[in-house]
């Protein structure tokens, strides 16, 4: 095989993964699959490894911040391991005497995983754990900027595998620097594809001829109504919005605040570090450059964002995020979409019904099928919202980023990849 032939390199990598998987399955047991998954979990959760991976991710991608990536790597992996701990994935997993139906778990084969630069450590680790838990092998295709982090992660995984005598070829990544051509070939020759990231990659996966699990676009909108605990709502929104510099697809991109408590909520939001800007065009002119999000603003720390937006002399010291009043929704109003930054769009609604309609319009523009939220004390309103909006999840009185992808204080399963159902152009709405 010539190293000058990138397609042949991918095919050879998948061939090694397939041979390793077949041996893994032939000698398989629940204990073996579980130990392989546990080895990967420890490879990323070990404190020194976690810190190094977080630092490397921020250094090479320029996205997010180290403390929050450390938290994310640990929390998402620990939560996933809790969720799958007692799930049977080998042999007979159910034998129903009443129906005469026996269910047997069988591996799929080689999983191809496309992962984003926003989570170059946590997402591949979670994909790898899920693959091994079910007796599969996996080949990861990281974003170009995520390659160093993925390489380091695999190095830690291999060290754990060597201790257990597990074949390294069960977990591989596309060799060398990633490219569209290499990723496309991986999509074509894998047995199942898992895609987290850009909608372009999702579309390519769905047209590759290989079964695919993929995610939809996020653009979370959250209602704050007149019955809400305003202090708690502001604190939760601030914590969620700023976590890892808003790299999560579950980060609030817009809040819709009912008029009766609008001014009071703005005061509470300011106490939690949110500075309100009423000139939306000023933000638009800085946040987008030639139709694209400004790389100097996206996923940056607060001081970097504020400087990029030209607001250094216009916001209070200690400002953690920028809240921007606006009215428009749709393609001609960029603030109504996903911003991947500490910028939060603020809509003012006349009442709850108007807030629901505004949220519906936002989701129809972008983010349908993903998730919305509400801060309220009215027991009936979350259900009203759920029945009115094209969404797969309604998060109630919680910090959205922490709740949507799984939490230890709610029933959502842990994941970094949210299926968005047919509304979001996906096969399923499950947490992948």
Where are these regions (language model features)?
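C-terminal segments
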Residues: 2-15, 84-87, 248, 275-316, ...
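Flexible, glycine/charged-enriched surface loops at secondary-structure junctions
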Residues: 26-34, 51-54, 167-170, 245-249, ...
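ALDH superfamily catalytic-core signature
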Residues: 4-6, 10, 125, 202-330
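Structural signal for hydrophobic packing residues in well-ordered secondary-structure cores
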Residues: 14, 18-25, 37-48, 57, ...
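N-terminal Rossmann-like NAD(P)+-binding subdomain of aldehyde/semialdehyde dehydrogenases
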Residues: 1-101, 130, 271
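Short, well-ordered beta-strand elements within core beta-sheets of diverse protein domains
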Residues: 18-26, 112, 254-257, 340-351, ...
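Short, flexible turn/loop "capping" segments at secondary-structure junctions
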Residues: 13-15, 214-216, 244-249, 333-340, ...
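Rossmann-like NAD(P) dinucleotide-binding subdomain of oxidoreductase/dehydrogenase enzymes
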Residues: 89-232
